[in-house]
Amino acid sequence: MRINPTTSGSEVSAVEKKNLGRIVKIIGPVLDVAFPPGKMPNIYNALVVQGRDNEQTNVTCEVQQLLGNNRVRAVAMSDTDGLMRGMEVIDTRAPISVPVGGSTLGRIFNVLGQPVDNLGPVDTNTTSPIHRSAPAFIQLDTKLSIFETGIKVVDLLAPYRRGGKIGLFGGAGVGKTVLIMELINNIAKAHGGVSVFGGVGERTREGNDLYLEMKESGVINEENIAESKVALVYGQMNEPPGARMRVGLTALTMAEYFRDVNEQDVLLFIDNIFRFVQAGSEVSALLGRMPSAVGYQPTLSTEMGSLQERITSTKEGSITSIQAVYVPADDLTDPAPATTFAHLDATTVLSRGLAAKGIYPAVDPLDSTSTMLQPRIVGEEHYETAQRVKQTLQRYKELQDIIAILGLDELSEEDRLTVARARKIERFLSQPFFVAEVFTGSPGKYVGLAETIRGFQLILSGELDGLPEQAFYLVGNIDEATAKAMNLKT
């Protein structure tokens, strides 16, 4: 940990100024800087541009290439407007470092760890460099364990791995944001953990909406900011590619501190992992590298691996990552999503069809997958229940065309029973969320895994065939469904 020369103007003057360079070339967000012989900065060092007459320009760059002839090529983390050849550049002799620890909760940061929420400076002197190695193999926690979310459809059919990586697929307006906020809320309540949200190359409006919704739902506590459950790091669409490429590492660095020092379970959200690859592709072209397949950077797998391998469980704590994945032109073979899939342990697919039916969370039970759903990991009882739920829903899906044309009466007795149970299961997969209480008026429910399994076993066994299907809609555990059925009858 070190005092951070990249996060505030006043500290730059404290940086030892012996290693000064000068800008010799500017091409968009890329600068070439000449240094005195024998004083070349290291790769990934942060450089701070000094304005004329010591006027602070606040442009921080990161060294990407050593060109020879005492020159380096650096990528700017902010706009290069107003920079000129001949300006002095300070080598900070360290990578970009960002504030870490409890004082980051409830705040919004940019890629350099500077707060951008107009709430004043961050109350910490503890900073950490954004570039570091993945934990050594001996530090890893290799035990496979389920990360219980309290959300029935996720825990039963596509369970998350503690310290794993989950891909979140869904279009606009199907409930990605609400699902993310519920997960942030549940990890804080059930696991005593915290969350870090990395907004990578997405719309500024969406980042602002998320912040306002988090304040409204209590995930960010305005009265007592220290009781907030999440830190936000944004590098939005309008930022230079350097910032969008590094903002994921800034968020990850904050999450690593909570895992390694505070020994907590951490949820790391990255929205959107595709934009991280896209920014790397832009930077790669600016640095003059030969493009690879479909115009992507030749270092695509390495860059993705260096980010993903740091997201893991250690003996101290865990980082479980949920990454929104944009699939360009719905082509799953595109190198960007294809490289991401190699790292994922589970996929959560949100369905517009379910959202249209009013079933929230609109997680598709048949399309969502998890490598954790194996009998040796989750146990025989969980595995069997999940498989029977999927088989029932799959059969219902196959029968829907027949029902639409001929009606329910033309089905066999067995198929009619399957349809009735499938409709109950479909409704029982819905759940009231804590963060949606403000909008729905229904109190949120956290359902433990054992309760979830028991509920679906009772539906599958036929014990609840006599209950109306609306009794299963937007309830927590199965006891609430039976109580609701009694109320409907009276």
UniProtKB/Swiss-Prot annotation:
Species lineage: Eukaryota, Viridiplantae, Streptophyta, Embryophyta, Tracheophyta
Alphabetized InterPro entries for the sequence: AAA+_ATPase, ATP-synt_VA_C, ATP_synth_F1_bsu, ATPase_a/bsu_AS, ATPase_alpha/beta_chains, ATPase_F1/V1/A1_a/bsu_N, ATPase_F1/V1/A1_a/bsu_N_sf, ATPase_F1/V1/A1_a/bsu_nucl-bd
GO CC terms: chloroplast thylakoid membrane; mitochondrion; proton-transporting ATP synthase complex
Residues engaged in binding ATP: 170-177
HAMAP family per UniProt: ATP_synth_beta_bact (MF_01347)
Recorded GO MF terms: ATP binding; ATP hydrolysis activity; proton-transporting ATP synthase activity, rotational mechanism
Major subcellular location class: plastid
Gene name tied to this protein: atpB
Alphabetic keyword roster: ATP synthesis, ATP-binding, CF(1), Chloroplast, Hydrogen ion transport, Ion transport, Membrane, Nucleotide-binding, Plastid, Thylakoid, Translocase, Transport
Name of the protein described by the UniProt record: ATP synthase subunit beta, chloroplastic
The keyword Zinc appears for this protein: no
Subcellular location: Plastid, Chloroplast thylakoid membrane
PANTHER family: ATP SYNTHASE, ATP SYNTHASE SUBUNIT BETA, MITOCHONDRIAL
Membrane disposition: Peripheral membrane protein
Catalysed conversion reaction: ATP + H2O + 4 H(+)(in) = ADP + phosphate + 5 H(+)(out)
